[in-house]
Amino acid sequence: GAEMCIVKQNWVLKDIFITYVSLWKGIYLAAKSLNSNIMIKKILTVAMLVCTCSSSLAQPHVNDGTSYLMNQALDMSTDFLDLSNTLFFADHLESFDVKSGEGLVNWKRGHLMPRQAFNTNGAQPRKMRMLDFPFTAYENDPNLKFKIDFVTPRTVRIRMLTTPVEPKVSTSIMLAKEPGKDESWKVTETENTIVYAGNYGTVQINKNPWRVVLKDKTGRILSQTVTLRDADSTQVKYTPFSFIKRGSDNARRINPVFTLTADEMIFGCGESATGLNKVGQKVNLFVTDPQGPETDQMYKPIPFFMSNRGYGMFMHTSAPVTCDFGATYIGLNKMFMGDENLDLFVFFGEPKDILDEYTDLVGKPGMPPLWSFGTWMSRITYFSEKEGYDVAANIRKNKYPCDVIHFDTGWFDVDWQCDYKFSENRFQNPQQMLKDLKSQGFHVCLWQLPYFTPKNRYFPELIKKDMYVKNGNGELPYEDVVLDFSNPETVNWYQNKLAGLLNIGVSAIKVDFGEAAPLNGIYASGKSGWYEHNLYPVRYDMAVSEITKKLHNENIMWARAAWAGSQRYPLHWGGDAATTNTGMLGTLRAGLSFGLSGFSFWSHDMGGFVKSTPEDLYCRWLPFGFLTSHTRAHGAPPTEPWLYDSKRVQDVFRKSAEMKYRLMPYVYAQAKECTEKGLPMLRALFVEFPDDPGAWKVDDEYLFGSQILVAPLLESGITLSLIHI
């Protein structure tokens, strides 16, 4: 196959060369016979154009790919259908030590060959003889490391390399601790199988063809890997368990592929607003700013999911990932990873077991302070000390329960120009204001962000001190400075700025943005944005949470972006929802999905963010907002109930707030359990009722904690809806 392609290409190039020689010979004879300098120039110009066009057509067109706008989600599946890339298919187990769980898998080199059949072009995988040079330096079908570890009685770790080079040992900030080693699994070996049996599941490794089979404790197959030998067609309907070597840069990308069954449902993957069950969807795990929870992009993608069949998976990588859950082939779960190696944790059990195991690995949240569960009053934005006092007075005058007043982008001299300093013109004595508000029972939260425009007063200092993410030339990749939180000196500088605010009485920091870390940037960690982009919110959240904990001994912040590891730092909110029914539905689905991804605490802007909220929508959204772990009124004004002419809005706001405050003993007790077991406060029904088939299909209701069923009214003009009980 490959050799024939090269021979044909060589003949084509030879034909082109002969054509060029003939063309130039004809031009020379024509010009000589005309004996005209002007005509010679014209003929030569035409000839040059012809040759240029022919030359461009003769070049192989590779790595066409897809063009992306900056910091938009990446689809990692496209690489695996690029004909310029070399594929390696997992084939058989070359060797294996059952005691250490370590061995070698043989990978067959191949590529996709175009195939025309009855006027339809497809592609077929074909084995390929290596053309790499020198031949003695490389393997045609390499044997590469495969390792399986048993972390707990419910957790298994599967690792695979795509090169002979072992990765450097480094600490992962996604993990809360180094995975342990459990000795309870028993191993047996036959001629073609190795079986590790545990109390909650079984892992079977088939030798030839190589296959990993996951079973529950009764022996029922939950899922298994898929090889090239399983292909069911002459065309490529799917790519099996494989990795690629890209023709453009020799980078490797791995694609673990597992089966999906007919009745299977998949949940998780972060704060996703699309259908709660991800089967039939392609989910791109890449931190971005979707400007609201109404699309398939996410502020908080998480490389973790669980199945209704009794298992979950955590893809331990910070590279971009695309999960194809039966979207392009209904029977397969394909995890197209931007990483060259596989590090996959598998969990066995019911949803509660899986969440507990997963959050043991990546970390459980600290308990937020009691006051944080109360009402947060805000808008975009309060601009002055006077507005702060006025809001506080109106809250108390109208008897709305409230614990927090938030100042968004307007507390600086210039709106949105973060310099960690209250405007002297509009905040005459901020420290006294904070003290006065505290005496009235209010905590204060302040907005900020990690980007510095050229007009920001800290811009020159950050450039001088090299505290920013750089491009390949050591300069700014954007017009703005993006703080490099992988640099300890940057973290120290940043935390000192926040400490100045926390020390004068500020209670919490809003950790806004964090989704735009340069993908092609170079970071102080020594890694590129390919691995640091998705980690950026974890580092950002960590920096804010740790300084707040150090100075106030409280686990609190208000963050928008997240990745695996961020769940240790409560809390996060749902971003800039549209002030529409769609915005409300997307917010509910996003919150449920986020909770199924290991996050206990979450909030959202009641009524939406983008525009002023219609009365009917606000009244339907308020009970949903107050029956969430954390509650905030925020967005385009008015958000304050007393500014609505409608008595209905005022009454619904007050009654909803009073309801939550009466429930506070329940709320706090449930929250404490969530920190211990990794459970979400906003809980999908099947978490509590996994044996109810109908509960797995509900995405417009939820449990607030374990005992309160909530069914928000998601349509205009309705007062009742059918619910699943």
Question: For each predicted feature, which ranges?
Answer:
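Catalytic and substrate-binding clefts that recognize carbohydrates or anionic sugar/phosphate headgroups
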Residues: 61, 138-140, 161-163, 179-369, ...
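A low-complexity, Ser/Thr/Gly/Pro-enriched, surface-exposed linker/loop concept
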Residues: 67-192, 234
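Bacterial Sec-dependent N-terminal signal peptides
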Residues: 11-60
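Aromatic- and carboxylate-enriched substrate-binding clefts and catalytic-loop regions
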Residues: 161-163, 170-173, 401-653, 688-690, ...
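Conserved small/polar residues in nucleotide/adenosyl-binding loops
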Residues: 5, 723-725
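Carbohydrate-binding surfaces of carbohydrate-active enzymes
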Residues: 126-143, 147-150, 158, 163, ...
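Extreme N-terminal basic, low-complexity initiation segments
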Residues: 2-9
